[in-house]
């Protein structure tokens, strides 16, 4: 039965259809200019950039020049890249320019679509940021698309981990900058910890196009980016606490997998109190006494490490380190660390070296970072399921771009088995069947553990002709994924295979050329070899198509429908045939957590025998409902995080704006003078209250305070004994003496040095107090939820108390700066203030725990070629992957010594 809404959509078209149609006149206009642009010489086409910039300077808007600018970018793309954007890609580009999200299916050329609005918006000269999910994609896309922008007279920069501040500053100064979301966020935080405006690297937030926008703005949104510094080493305590956990039984604790929480029962608490008392770690009688808060925290982390975190699913142990696995992508995140002691608890569990804990120095969520941009847009293949969130939080519409060719992929109903064993048996049988008919197969798993289990089961069946792609072997990721479309190929992959690299039927020409011809110099011989490879790929493609195209088999449903859709979307690109199917069991995490007991009983009543599956659209709908529940819960979490983070964000903006003003100021005399005046006001009000009798004045307290804050020994006792003296008189005398002392110091130092000293002291003091403030807000937030039991709104309570804490911060700043400036003396060479040792982190999106990564301010130095010893790699410094290897082999670094970086022997 067709719904009324369905009838209306057929008659009038959906809102999405109407929005797409609204761009059609511009498409027609761009196409009308095609012949004219094609007739231009390379020089004349490139000169259009200067012409457009002049038009903008004369008062035209970007919208006014959209049609000719898109026509120029399209023609330049055809000449430089050999790719001409289709009409639907022009529409995608216009969607991005209009501050919206373009939902485009896999293989529809999102990277090429981005070049059109990037070129148009870069003409304004304010910079455009193209945001990717990893360094590999940032480098790949900037290198490829940089040729196009360079042809049109624009500079392209790329920000990746390991660049110096000078390199970052230069990259941000380019017309177009490619970077990962993490690098952008960390650079923003680090910039706001600098002590000189000239040291800052970013130049503003004009326009950002976020690739894989759902991954960055949704999956990562509930977890802040954090810059932190090391605390004292407490590794012995972690090891001692860890030893208690194996002595507990199941009755001693409760695990909630839905909420990812672990708590001790009453019996468990008593048992732990006995253990801690014997170890001399318990203070007082009860574990939950105030003085035992830190111990409770350690014990909870140890319990989570053993009962919630699974090795080879949540993390792996590699090179004697605990390395986090991203649950959304399956990728390893080397250097990232959980915060709050959780990573140390895992290190104690795995008996590897325990690294020191960290203290938060600065933090921001991606939600608040990306909302700073004047214009924001995004691209992805899967955004419609989160359209409400994009609209509510970022003000972004999601517009589905039609595919250039109809999708031919067949999405089959799920098959549900009772146990893992039955499910994997069915999957292997299906893989072998597809392999017999030469059909390429991509098998998606949710964890490393599952991918390796499936691989082992296949080996036991005697089948070894497959590739395994998971976080253990991520170095080979791009090539394995690129070749997954070859006839008969079987690729077992975690979620990481879902993004970044296209699976092309028959294989990927670019990857084949790089692998097979990297030692062949450019020339006729190389050109002929490329032509041979291209011909071979075409033959293989036809074989893959004849076998039914790429067959995506999923071994489990993810809690997010988007991740499932991404996996499905690997098949059926650009009108190719394809097929997808999910194999599930009642023991899968999603089924088990969301009420599979009922379903198991029902299947038994239906008489389902071992090895048999149930296939029914009702199952798909039930699973979709479960996934929607999880997505709704996660959306609520993200909305809640944002409400609280907005409080911190407002305060962060004030502090960061103040820092910039302080760095820009040429004279801080008035600023520190106001602080000094406020301190005097506070001291007099506190020790000589208004309308109090002279006998009630606290002369001793005032004298001590003046000595502490102004380094002055004043006859305050004599002043208060004078006949008829009032608090205003004392205030005036204090002000006069303090101003005179400050003026004498300023004259002694000289204006230039005095301003430098004032700026250094104010900035360093502000930074130290801001760090303490972040910790205080974290503590406040961790307990504010209990106010709900008293029928008070925790958010409103948090806002009120956060404001009081902020007022206290400003008051402490005035006092600390005044006291330090009163005592500061001139030394021969004033030391440049140095930022603290820093680490970066981004909390894992699925567990709500931090992931800490050491991010040095400057990680590696660049060494000039003449200072490199070919025999000693330690003298080489940082080397670009495409540079010649310093060893003298003649090969590119990535194909010589660079090939050994980060690899492990498997």
Swiss-Prot record:
EC number of this enzyme: 7.4.2.8
Keyword vocabulary terms for this entry: ATP-binding, Cell inner membrane, Cell membrane, Cytoplasm, Membrane, Metal-binding, Nucleotide-binding, Protein transport, Translocase, Translocation, Transport, Zinc
Catalytic activity: ATP + H2O + cellular proteinSide 1 = ADP + phosphate + cellular proteinSide 2
Membrane-related topology note: Peripheral membrane protein
Binding site residues for Zn(2+): 885, 887, 896-897
Places the protein is found: Cell inner membrane; Cytoplasm
InterPro entries tied to this protein: Helicase_ATP-bd, P-loop_NTPase, Rhodanese-like_dom, SEC_C_motif, SecA, SecA_CS, SecA_DEAD, SecA_motor_DEAD
Entry keyword Lyase: no
General function of this protein: Part of the Sec protein translocase complex. Interacts with the SecYEG preprotein conducting channel. Has a central role in coupling the hydrolysis of ATP to the transfer of proteins into and across the cell membrane, serving both as a receptor for the preprotein-SecB complex and as an ATP-driven molecular motor driving the stepwise translocation of polypeptide chains across the membrane.
NCBIfam families listed in its UniProt record: PRK12904.1, secA
Protein name: Protein translocase subunit SecA
Lineage: Bacteria, Pseudomonadati, Pseudomonadota, Alphaproteobacteria, Hyphomicrobiales
Name of the gene this protein is made from: secA
């Amino acid at each position: 039965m067709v719904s009324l809404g369905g009838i209306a959509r057929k008659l009038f078209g959906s809102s999405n259809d109407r929005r797409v149609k609204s761009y059609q006149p511009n498409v027609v206009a761009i196409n009308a200019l095609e012949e004219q642009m094609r007739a231009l010489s390379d020089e004349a086409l490139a000169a259009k950039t200067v012409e457009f910039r002049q038009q903008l300077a004369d008062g035209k808007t970007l919208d006014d020049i959209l049609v000719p600018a898109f026509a120029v970018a399209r023609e330049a793309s055809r000449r430089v890249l050999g790719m001409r954007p289709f009409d639907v890609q022009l529409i995608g580009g216009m969607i991005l320019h209009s501050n919206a999200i373009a939902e485009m299916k896999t293989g529809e050329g999102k990277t090429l679509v981005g070049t059109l609005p990037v070129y148009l918006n870069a003409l304004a000269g304010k910079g455009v940021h193209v945001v990717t999910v990893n360094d590999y994609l940032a480098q790949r896309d900037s290198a490829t698309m940089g040729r196009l922008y360079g042809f049109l007279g624009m500079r392209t920069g790329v920000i990746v981990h390991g660049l110096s501040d000078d390199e970052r500053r230069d990259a941000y100064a380019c017309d177009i900058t490619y970077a990962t979301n993490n690098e952008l966020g960390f650079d923003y935080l680090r910039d706001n910890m600098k002590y000189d405006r000239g040291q800052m690297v970013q130049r503003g937030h004009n326009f950002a196009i976020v690739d894989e926008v759902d991954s960055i703005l949704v999956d990562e949104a509930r977890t802040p980016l954090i810059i932190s510094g090391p605390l004292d080493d407490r590794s012995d305590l972690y090891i001692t606490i860890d030893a208690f956990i194996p002595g507990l039984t199941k009755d001693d604790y409760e695990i909630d997998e839905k909420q990812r929480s672990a708590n001790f029962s009453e019996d468990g608490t008593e048992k732990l109190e006995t253990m801690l008392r014997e170890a001399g770690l318990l203070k007082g009688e009860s574990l939950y006494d105030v003085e035992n808060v830190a111990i409770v925290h350690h014990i909870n982390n140890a319990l989570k490490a053993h009962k919630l975190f699974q090795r080879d699913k949540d993390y792996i142990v590699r090179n004697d380190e605990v390395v986090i696995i991203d649950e959304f992508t399956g990728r390893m995140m080397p250097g990232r660390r959980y915060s709050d002691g959780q990573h140390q608890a895992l290190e104690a569990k795995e008996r590897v070296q325990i690294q020191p804990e960290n203290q938060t120095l600065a933090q921001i969520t991606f939600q608040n970072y990306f909302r700073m941009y004047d214009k924001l847009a995004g691209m992805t293949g899967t955004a419609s399921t989160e359209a409400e969130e994009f609209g509510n939080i970022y003000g972004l519409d999601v517009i589905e771009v039609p595919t250039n060719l109809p999708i031919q992929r067949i999405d089959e109903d799920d098959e549900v088995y009772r146990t893992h064993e039955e499910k994997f048996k069915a999957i292997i049988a299906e893989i072998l069947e597809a392999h017999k008919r030469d059909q390429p197969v991509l098998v998606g798993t949710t964890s490393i553990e599952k991918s390796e289990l499936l691989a082992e089961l296949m080996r036991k069946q005697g089948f070894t002709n497959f590739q395994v792609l998971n976080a253990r072997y991520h170095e080979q990721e791009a090539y394995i994924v690129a070749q997954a479309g070859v006839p008969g190929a079987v690729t077992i992959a975690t979620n990481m295979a879902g993004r970044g690299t296209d699976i092309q039927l028959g294989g990927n020409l670019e990857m084949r050329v790089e692998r097979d011809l990297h030692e062949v110099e450019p020339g006729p011989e190389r050109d002929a070899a490329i032509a041979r490879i291209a011909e071979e790929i075409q033959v293989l493609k036809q074989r893959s198509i004849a076998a039914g195209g790429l067959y995506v088999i999923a071994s489990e449903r993810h809690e997010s429908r988007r991740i499932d859709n991404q996996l499905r979307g690997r098949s059926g690109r650009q009108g190719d045939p394809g097929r997808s199917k999910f194999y599930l069991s009642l023991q899968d995490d999603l089924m088990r957590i969301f009420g599979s007991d009922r379903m198991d009983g029902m299947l038994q009543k239906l008489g389902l025998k071992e090895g048999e599956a149930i296939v029914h659209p009702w199952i798909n709908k039930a699973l979709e409902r479960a996934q929607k529940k999880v997505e709704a819960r996660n959306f609520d979490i993200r909305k809640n995080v944002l409400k609280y983070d907005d409080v911190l964000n407002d305060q962060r903006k004030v502090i960061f704006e103040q820092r910039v003003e302080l760095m820009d100021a040429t004279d801080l005399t008035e600023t520190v003078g106001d602080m000094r005046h406020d301190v005097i006001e506070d001291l007099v009000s506190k020790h000589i209250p208004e309308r109090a009798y002279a006998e009630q004045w606290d002369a001793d307290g005032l004298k001590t305070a003046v000595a502490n804050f102004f380094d002055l020994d004043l006859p305050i006792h004599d002043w208060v004994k004078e006949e008829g003296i009032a608090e205003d008189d004392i205030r005036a005398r204090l002000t006069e003496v303090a101003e005179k002392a400050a003026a004498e110091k300023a004259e002694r130092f000289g204006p230039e040095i005095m301003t430098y000293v004032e700026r250094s002291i104010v900035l360093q003091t502000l930074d130290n107090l801001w760090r303490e403030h972040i910790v205080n807000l974290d503590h406040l937030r961790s307990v504010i939820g209990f106010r709900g039991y008293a029928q008070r709104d925790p958010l409103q309570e948090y806002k009120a108390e956060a404001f009081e804490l902020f007022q206290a911060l400003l008051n402490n700043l005035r006092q600390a700066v005044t006291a330090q400036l009163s005592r500061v003396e001139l030394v021969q060479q004033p030391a440049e203030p140095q930022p603290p040792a820093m680490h970066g982190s981004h909390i894992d999106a699925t567990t709500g725990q931090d992931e800490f990564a050491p991010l040095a301010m400057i990680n590696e130095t660049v060494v000039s070629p003449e200072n490199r010893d070919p025999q000693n790699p330690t003298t080489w410094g940082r080397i670009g992957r495409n540079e010649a290897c310093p060893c003298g082999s003649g090969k590119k670094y990535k194909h010589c010594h660079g090939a050994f970086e980060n690899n492990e022997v498997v």
